[in-house]
Amino acid sequence: MARQLSVILVALTLTTALAENFPTRTSAPSDCPQADQGCWCHKNFAQCWSTYDDSRLTEEIGSRITRLELLYQPNEEVVTYIRRMSALREIRISEDGMSLDCSCDLVDAMDDKGITLVNQDELEIRNCRQQGWSRDTMTARPFLIECRRFRIQDDDRRKRRDAEQDSDDVTKRASPRKGDKPAGHKLKDLAPKDTHHLVSIDDVEKHPATDFFNFISGHRRTRRSTGTNEEVSDDSGRSARKKRYGNMNYPQPMNQPMGGGNYPGQPPQQNYAPQGMGGPVGGGGMGGAVGAGAMGGPVGGGGGGMGGPVGGANGIGESVEDEMSVDSDYSSLGGETTISAKVIQDIKNLLGATKIDLPVDINDPYYLGLLLRHLRHHSNLLANIGDPEVREQVLSAMQEEEEEEENDAANGVRENVLNNLNAPGQGGYGGTQGGMRGGAGGGMMGNQGMGGQGYNQGYMQG
C-alpha cells in the first residue's frame, strides 16, 4: 500500500514538472480551463475545441494563457481567440478535418498582436484558387509571407493616395512654375466683394474667368495657312495683331503700294517703293493739269514717305491709319470681344495687387500679348485662379503666345535679310521740276526701278 502511494506521488510530481510555466491543474479553478467547457490544459498548451463563447474563458484566464492550441476552428473563430486573449504569444492551429480559408485576416490579426504560429511549416492552407491565388494549396509559411507583402503594398498605396489628397489644395501648394513659395494673395483678401477667379463681380452682368480667357484667345491669330497644309486655319478673314517686327526696308508684295507714278499717256502702273523713303513722285495718272497723279496731293504727284503737303499723301500715315482701322475692328467682332470699362478696372485692381503694370488699352491685341507675357512671369496670379481647367487654358494660351512671338522675331529677321539682298535701288524724292510742276514733264519715274541714284534732284526724262 505504501509503495502504491509512492508511485502516485512520483507521477503527480512528474506531471507538475512537465507543465513548466503554463497554468497547471491545481485546486484553483482559475488556473486552467475545464474540459467540460471545451478547453483544457494539454502539453503546455491550452487546448480548445469549442468556439470562444462556448468555452466560457474568463478575462482572468485569458490574461494568463500565453500558449494556445485550437482544434476544429474556422478562420473567424481563430481571429476571435487571438483578439480576446491579451497574454497570448504562441498559437498552434491543428487542422483535424477543418480547412482554413486563404484569407489574410488571420495573418493580420497575428501580426497586430505579435503572435507566432508555431506549426507554420506543417499547417496547410487549401482551396486558395477560389480566392484568386495562383496555387490551390500551400503551407502556412509562404502564405504568411505573401499576406505580409500584400499588406505592405496596400499601406504604401494608401500613404501615396493620402499625400496626393493633402497636396491638392491650390492655396497651400507652391507656385506651379517657380516652385518657391505658396501664393501670397488670395482672391478673398484682394476684394471683399463677390469674386469669380480673375474678375471681381458686384453687378448683375457677370464676367467669369472663362469670358476673360475667351476674350484673350479670340484676338490671338491662328497658325498661318500654307499652300501645302489645308488643315491649318486661314486667318485672312480675321484681324491679325500688329507686327512687332515691322518691315522698315523694302516692302514685300503684300505691303501697301506707295506713289504710283507712270509715263504720260500710259495706263497707271504700280511701283513699289520703300515704306520710309517715298515712292515715285511727279506726273502720274493721265497727265493732270498740274501733274496730279493717281495718289496726287493738292499740287504735285503722288508723294512717298517723305512727301509733305506738297508731294501728296504720306505713305507711313496711310499704313498706320490702315493698321489702326484694322485693330479698331476688334471691339465689334461678334459683339462679344469688347471688355467693359468696369471689368477692365477690376482686372487692373487684381493685377495691381500682384504688382503687374497693366497696359492702358487692353482691347489692343499688341497689349494683350504684353499682358500674357506679364502673366507668364507672375505665376502667383495663375495660382489664384480657382478653376483648374481655366488655369490650364490660360497657361496654354501664354505658352502659345510666346512661341508665336519667337516665330515673329525669327521671321522678321529673315525677311529683312532677304529684302536687303533683293531690294531695288532707292527711289529719290523725284525731280523737283516734276514734283512741283506737272507741266515741265518731269517726275515720271524719279530714277526708280532698276537701281537709279537716290536723291537725284531734278532729272527730267522725256
Curated annotation (Swiss-Prot):
Region (Fucose-binding domain) location: 372-380
One GO BP annotation of this record: fusion of sperm to egg plasma membrane involved in single fertilization
Principal location class: cytoplasm
Subcellular location: Cytoplasmic vesicle, Secretory vesicle, Acrosome lumen
Chain spans, region Disordered: 155-194, 221-278
Signal peptide: 1-19
This protein's GO CC annotations: acrosomal lumen
Pro-piece positions: 20-244
Keywords for this protein: Cell adhesion, Cleavage on pair of basic residues, Cytoplasmic vesicle, Fertilization, Signal
Summary of the function given for this chain in its UniProt record: Species-specific sea urchin sperm protein required for adhesion of sperm to the egg surface during fertilization. Bindin coats the acrosomal process after it is externalized by the acrosome reaction. It binds to sulfated, fucose-containing polysaccharides on the vitelline layer receptor proteoglycans which cover the egg plasma membrane.
Family from the record: Belongs to the bindin family.
Protein name stated in the entry: Bindin
Organism: Lytechinus variegatus
Lineage, opening ranks: Eukaryota, Metazoa, Echinodermata, Eleutherozoa, Echinozoa
